[in-house]
Amino acid sequence: MTPDPRLADSAFLKAARGEPVPHTPVWYMRQAGRSLPEYLAVREGIGMLESCMDPDLVVEITLQPVRRYGVDAAIFFSDIVLPLKAVGVDLDIKPGVGPVVAHPVRTLADVEAIPDLTPEHVPFITEAVRGLVGELGGTPLIGFAGAPFTVASYLVEGGPSKEHARTKAMMFGAPDVWDALLRKIAGISASYLEVQVAAGASAVQLFDSWAGALTPADYRAFVMPHSARVLERAGALGVPRIHFGVGTANLLGLMGEAGADVVGVDWRTPLAHAIALVGDRGVQGNLDPTLVFAPTEVMTARAAEIVEAGRAARGHIFNLGHGVIPSTDPDQLKRLTEFVQTYPR
């Protein structure tokens, strides 16, 4: 669809492309979520996956933080396992646990049984994105997908894991199955991003939540080529690509090399160090999410340090170093947003 002409002035998109910005743009991972009373109200009694498949609800939830905070970008409300559910994988998201897969992937036959994703699998995504773009006007919408390693971990472990033992056992011990699985997921994630961009998303973010469990050598050998496939297909869409993982200080350079325009940085890595690692790419981050619980002057002082450090990057998008914590005070996040957006350039 035809982009809103006001998007040409978006500070978020300018920063993502490495262009001069009127102010440091800001948005937050999980900005639409349990920290907002209006989110809890509309989600009451409705499961996560059911919520993600209801276009009207997705539009409302995605818009809530834009209305409340005035952030510089909206991120599409969904879940990284939704594309798997859409193609027929038997899974659910259990409160307090996370995604649970009924029949974990163990063999090549298990991989081959997973269908490729087509737009016909996710008509509700197209409808929701189109509705959002119409409502957002000059505020860009970020589409997103899960990166192959993180999605593979859920499929192999059968749910969330701290050790990723079965995942790594397959990676090291059954490389043919591993390669087939990550190729399959890369195709699904890339197709999911294509659907969102075709409907009007202005940027994409690839989430690799569990990549920090890998050494640089293992990431390069077993994971990076598959993430690169997703980012390459996203690059062909002509929108900025953000690549984010948690605990990835030793992988930031490689995550950029995989094909990102902007590399997300968690709170444990000094932003100046991250900028040196990613080279001629933008960065996103990276305030510790718990600093929103600190006195306002402490929070804003740390935010100022991050904004100042971000000046050395090709482009800087302010964010937390991970998702908004559910018990966060929305009023404090509003103060943070206004502070960053009005901080002198």
Swiss-Prot record:
A molecular function (GO) term: uroporphyrinogen decarboxylase activity
UniProt-listed PANTHER family: METHYLTETRAHYDROFOLATE:HOMOCYSTEINE METHYLTRANSFERASE RELATED, UROPORPHYRINOGEN DECARBOXYLASE
Name of the gene this protein is made from: hemE
Family in the record: Belongs to the uroporphyrinogen decarboxylase family.
Main location: cytoplasm
Upper taxonomic lineage: Bacteria, Bacillati, Actinomycetota, Actinomycetes, Propionibacteriales
Record site: Transition state stabilizer: D79
The organism's place on the tree of life at top rank: Bacteria
EC code: 4.1.1.37
Pathway entry: Porphyrin-containing compound metabolism; protoporphyrin-IX biosynthesis; coproporphyrinogen-III from 5-aminolevulinate: step 4/4
Annotated substrate binding sites: R30, Q31, A32, G33, R34, D79, Y154, S209, H322
Protein's UniProt keywords contain Phosphoprotein: no
GO terms for cellular component: cytosol
Catalysis performed (reactions): uroporphyrinogen III + 4 H(+) = coproporphyrinogen III + 4 CO2
One Pfam family here: URO-D
Protein name as catalogued: Uroporphyrinogen decarboxylase
Localization: Cytoplasm
